[in-house]
């Protein structure tokens, strides 16, 4: 359970840092248009902090954590951080007005997509693990 609490705390800090960076970076550059930097804060709060706080409560109630859960959570962490990193990369490019080549634009989108896939697949596996611990075993 300590692992879930530590992860929630880490993602809360990353969410706040992402929000402050978005606000200060856009203010410093005078940028007023829409940018993907604005979603880093929400993604880290909801998919990071809130998700791990929910896992903490579910673990306390149902004790679903097993040997494979750590590996699935590692994939979840990789997926969330890869997604957020690509939001930051694209957002900085938007704010600074970089003209991305077609290849670089596709690479950023591709890595963000891989992050989303890892995030989604690991979330489903965690939910199945929780479901397995809640439902009675079939005889």
Where would I find each of the regions flagged by the language model?
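Hydrophobic alpha-helical transmembrane segments of multi-pass integral membrane proteins
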Residues: 1-139
